[in-house]
Amino acid sequence: MRKLLLAFCAFATICSAGAQWKPAGDKIKTDWAEKVDPRNVLPEYPRPGMERADWQNLNGEWEYAILPKGQAEPTSFDGNILVPFAVESSLSGVQKEVGEKNELWYKRTFTVPSSWKGKDILLNFGAVDWKADVFVNDILIGSHTGGFTPFSLNITPYLNGKSTHKLVVRVWDPSDKGYQPRGKQVANPEGIWYTPVTGIWQTVWLEPVASSHITSIKAIPNIDNGVMSVTVGACSDSPVSDIVEVSLLDKGQVVATAKGVQGTELRLAVQNPTLWEPSNPYLYDMKVSLSKNGKKVDEVKSYTAFRKISAERDANGIMRMRLNNKNLFQYGPLDQGWWPDGLYTAPTDEALLYDIVKTKAWGFNMIRKHVKVEPARWYYHCDKEGMLVWQDMPSGDMGNQWAPHTYN
């Protein structure tokens, strides 16, 4: 009987947690809105270009509060918000405006798995619009400015030995009242201008790493000589002695390997590589590892492709865009990346992929991403599906307040 009661209580708790969230307002919903699970929001690893096996997703229900700018952390919060959907969106469960005179506060707790003991813990944000201050256990550990770029913070020194830790994020976003890049966001949307996107709008996650660990991977293909040049960046206390190894795999088989000091350019030669093109979006897997004193301390998965994009004048002097040394007429839609229910954030990864697949099915080979930078998984799907991307810089204020006002 006791086991039955415990099982019922556990079930009731789960149901209650799920029942707390629901889309707010009466905005149009996509078909994927009903597939959003508050206990498992966007569960896919968010950084396909540098993927670690061990990680913890912090998406889900957080507490939120909207307060006048400059006030201290609230002692009580307004309710729950479903991260990573912006507070103005329906899928956040809130659908409230913040404005340039207020700040948006987030709060949640998290635990660090016992298996991560002895590791450094990185707290990663896919994107927060616009200025974010991050607190762990009531200590301001870092800030980031920029609504479209990811950032990571090493939170290890601020974990206090307790099993549960407090995470607070404070966000200020003036939208069109500021000078920052913001794309189509305005306080009073109309016509071609859309709703502001304030706060966390991409996945938040934790991952354990060694004190020396991989931080970046840059791969540049040369199809004319069959060489992939790879530069691996690392956080290291002994950069000269830390060695990276890169393996290039074709359908699971290693076809090239190179080793070197982190930060140096490694060249991997492949005979007759298969070239990437829209009709055959061929990708090579990469395994990248970092070793210290001969011991492997970090390993990530990545991918790349052999392709060349160039421009050349034809016999009539007209500049032609080329792919893999052949003329390619690129044609595709202007894609603004807005969702009626999630604003900047797609309801699910399936939804994110759908638009790309449908665009390809309509006969296009290119998407112009208009004044928005998408999550990394969007570009990954384009690579896999054979879609070229023209990337816009998100537009900002015409006043250029960051630039000098006098010129010689």
Short names for language-model regions:
Residues 141-142, 255, 328:
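Short hydrophobic beta-strand segments in globular cytosolic domains
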Residues 1-21:
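Bacterial Sec-dependent N-terminal signal peptides
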Residues 20-55:
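N-terminal pre-domain segments of enzymes
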Residues 62, 138, 204, 284, ...:
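Conserved, mostly hydrophobic/aromatic
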Residues 63-67, 96-97, 101-213, 238, ...:
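Accessory beta-strand-rich segments of carbohydrate-active enzymes
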Residues 355-407:
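Aromatic-lined substrate-binding rim segments of carbohydrate-active enzymes
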Residues 136, 227-260, 266, 286-288:
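Beta-strand-rich binding/interaction modules
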Residues 217-221, 287-359:
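N-terminal carbohydrate-binding accessory modules
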